[in-house]
Amino acid sequence: AGARYAGVIPKPRDGMGWQVDAERLAEEVAVSPVIVVLDAPWVDAAEFEVLSRFIDQRVNHLVVGAGANTARVGPMTIAGRGPCTRCDELLQQDMDPSWRTLSAQLALDDPPARGAVLSVLAAAEAARQVESAVQGTHSASLDAVLRTGRGGSAWTRRALIRHTKCSCWWASVNGTESG
């Protein structure tokens, strides 16, 4: 089966019923590998909820986003193993207790303008990361977030660590994770 468009992640700004629509989208994706395109180069609260379902359901996914000044690719999560987006978001909340509130506000606001060049760069890098994973070579986004700026600078890699409150690492503690 080839790639297909699954839909836009519903947000509170979409009106009543957005949570039901988000659950429906997550169920529709089921176990199909997916590229999650964000509104911006950060994860807002609504996107976090959908991504958390993908992690819990062990759906292979890659997070991609672009804004006016920066773009991100990653992390790529395979079979629910992390470090994952939830690890990154929990760490962000640990470092900045107001992040959860800000993240919820970002889900209400209209998305920022996207730079065309950054959107193309993010799409190209996402394709490169998926190709690496499919070929069985190490994908730089597997346990990291890659970022680039408006000037077209080189991609930088920020390695992620597993967060103790995230379920992505629990399988390894229980001895059920291979690898």
What does each model-found stretch correspond to?
Residues 1-179:
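Adenine nucleotide-associated cytosolic modules
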